[in-house]
From Swiss-Prot:
Gene: Ddit4
GO cellular component: cytoplasm; cytosol; mitochondrion
Alphabetized GO MF terms: 14-3-3 protein binding
Quaternary structure and partners: Monomer. Interacts with BTRC. Identified in a complex with CUL4A, DDB1 and BTRC. Interacts with TXNIP; this inhibits the proteasomal degradation of DDIT4.
InterPro entries registered for this protein in UniProt: RTP801-like, RTP801-like_C_sf
Name of protein: DNA damage-inducible transcript 4 protein
The keyword Ligase is annotated on this UniProt entry: no
């Protein structure tokens, strides 16, 4: 009579031999294809070359591992996931931003030249890249509204799009602030709004290093994300 251990061993070996790896779970490529389709769906009416897919088939993780890995990444670690193309686009965007600020109007008929300190320029660039990292089209899908706070009012300065041919997937509102030490100059600028001065630029004004960014996804009903820096 066979022992209990022999029967258990025979049953286990026959069970394991009848099971195939393919039946346990789908191949990793199926997850990559599904992720790619999801990314392309978010950029409807765009060619596939216009978007960075959300393909994770080459990441070395399965769906569950990918999700748990991304959940565990802290915000500073996103610098390690930077995209060279997005970094190049961000540099161009910062140049457009400075050009727009050089002709800003703050309630006056004459444009003021608003200057961004180097620290502010660097911080804004990093924040925009961080907010764009999870978007299907990256920074190319951003529509950037630029505003400047002046006391209790907020003036719209410009609306920038890196790729006008691309349907925006998310909107960023950048709220800059004037340096509080410049209030006497600002008041003088506003008081000259109705004066008959020779057309041209008013005096230059420096912006504060503090700013706020509001993110709104245009393909989702998620709540607004407000980042204070």
């Amino acid at each position: 009579m066979p022992s209990l251990w022999d029967r258990f061993s025979s049953s286990s070996s026959s069970s394991s031999s009848s099971r195939t790896p393919a039946a346990d779970r789908p191949p990793r490529s199926a997850w990559g294809s599904a992720a790619r389709e999801e990314g392309l769906d978010r950029c409807a009416s765009l060619e596939s070359s216009d978007c960075e897919s959300l393909d994770s088939s080459n990441s070395g993780f399965g769906p569950e591992e990918d999700s748990s890995y991304l959940d565990g990444v802290s915000l500073p670690d996103f610098e390690l996931l930077s995209d060279p193309e997005d970094e190049h686009l961000c540099a161009n965007l910062m140049q457009l931003l400075q050009e727009s600020l050089s002709q800003a109007r703050l309630g006056s008929r004459r444009p003021a030249r608003l200057l961004m300190p180097s620290q502010l320029l660097s911080q804004v660039g990093k924040e925009l890249l961080r907010l764009a990292y999870s978007e299907p089209c990256g920074l190319r899908g951003a529509l950037l509204d630029v505003c400047v706070e002046q006391g209790k009012s907020c003036h719209s300065v410009a609306q920038l799009a890196l790729d006008p041919s691309l349907v925006p997937t998310f909107q960023l509102t950048l709220v800059l602030r004037l340096d509080s030490r410049l209030w006497p100059k600002i008041q003088g600028l506003l008081s000259s709004a109705n004066s008959s001065l020779v057309p041209g630029y008013s005096q230059s004004l420096t912006l504060s290093t503090g700013f706020r960014v509001i993110k709104k996804k245009l393909y989702s009903s998620e709540q607004l994300l407000i980042e204070e820096c």
